[in-house]
Amino acid sequence: NDTPKSVLLGTWKITKKVENGEIKELYSDCDANETFVFQEKEAINESYQKGKFNPYDNKLECRSQKEVYPTYEYKKEENKLYLETEVNGKPLMISQKITLENNNTQLTIYHNYYAEKTYRVYTKQK
């Protein structure tokens, strides 16, 4: 059952973040916990924003931000991932360039406008 969508099913954890050609450090407390979860119908991207530093346990507070896409589609021949989002109350499919490598265990999602220089790499979780 190797439909284009089936290769994405599961949980992907961020392993690399590049902005404008510069590799950004993944601060273990927050950034490194970002995941992209692909289910049968929906896709969920959960990232964490750095919050305040907590002096009591010497940790950064991480605020979870969840984006839920009710549907998604992967067009392998185009290397595009289509995510359904809502704009002004209407559903809209946005596309992002993606690549799958290393036997479909490494997923790179490119930022639309700075595709070559801004992207995130996720690794499939067992």
For every predicted segment, state its role:
Residues 8-10, 31-34, 39-40, 68-70, ...:
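Residues that flank catalytic or metal-binding motifs in active/ligand-binding sites
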Residues 1-13:
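N-terminal helix-cap/turn-to-beta initiation motif at the start of protein domains
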Residues 26-32, 61-64, 113-114:
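Functionally engaged cysteine thiol sites
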Residues 13-42:
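Short, solvent-exposed loop/hinge segments that bridge or flank secondary-structure elements
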Residues 116-126:
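Short, low-complexity, Pro/Ser/Thr/Gly-rich segments in the mature regions of secreted, periplasmic
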Residues 15, 84-86, 110-112:
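A generic structural motif
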Residues 41-104:
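Contiguous, well-ordered beta-strand patches that form the walls/edges
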Residues 106-116:
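Short, exposed beta-strand-loop hairpins at the edges of beta-sheets
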